[in-house]
Amino acid sequence: MNSSSAVSKRLEGKVAIVTGGASGIGASTVSLFHDHGAKVVIADIQDNLGQTLAGRLGRNISYIHCDVTDENQVRALVDATVAKHGGVDIMFSNAGIVEGPTVSIFDADKGALERLLGINLVGGFLAAKHAARVMSPTKKGCIIFTASACTEVAGISGPGYVASKYGIVGLMKSLAAELGSHGIRANCVSPFGVLTGIAAGDDKTKLMFEGLMSKVGNLKGKILTADDVAKAALYLASDEASYVSGVNLVLDGGYSVVNP
């Protein structure tokens, strides 16, 4: 039974692009959007994973190789989606990287910082720019970014990563203000710790991660998953959130409330 069997399909007829859609939060969102009736374009640089996911989901799913730091590729991604499906209703700018273990400002490397900002912040900017370009004539659309709970609580991530995600939240708020007159909404999902990628398939790592999150998390008896983040993105993308814009939706089980 798929996730949309008990309720109406909330994205029926919509066209969505998901950057970083080949794995992790992106892949979970691609699957959920597809379950809810959307035509989804997976954009990523992980070609094997992206093509495999598209093949598994089948109808109304396609994959396009896209490096979000390259504006020509982002422009081509959006234009190809319009050519194939007639428009873009939802841009989920999810592509991003992390620093690994928390990096101190004393150990920060300029090249690594520029790469981090290039993918996490500039990539989001370019995705939004070209999505807005094709959404504006239709006077509707939805842009969603993956930010982070580190935008609400200090000290849980390295300074470079925090800077990139604060930048995304600032960008989102600026776009919510500017694009409102064009009928375009902009929001963020900001998850707490989520285990994704290769590590998620390793039982030992998974148990260690779940133990850590159970210890430090505020909401007991529950660990945040990529599927949980996908459900938040689904809400923001759906007509149920038709008057929701400028929101940083933090998924942290109340951690930021008790650790201000």
Curated annotation (Swiss-Prot):
Annotated keywords: NAD, Oxidoreductase
An example Gene Ontology molecular-function term: (+)-borneol dehydrogenase activity
Enzyme class, broadest EC rank: oxidoreductase
Record's keyword annotation contains Oxidoreductase: yes
Sequence intervals crossing the membrane: none
Pfam families noted in UniProt: adh_short_C2
Annotated family: Belongs to the short-chain dehydrogenases/reductases (SDR) family.
Official protein name in the record: (+)-borneol dehydrogenase 1
Species per Swiss-Prot/TrEMBL record: Salvia officinalis (Sage)
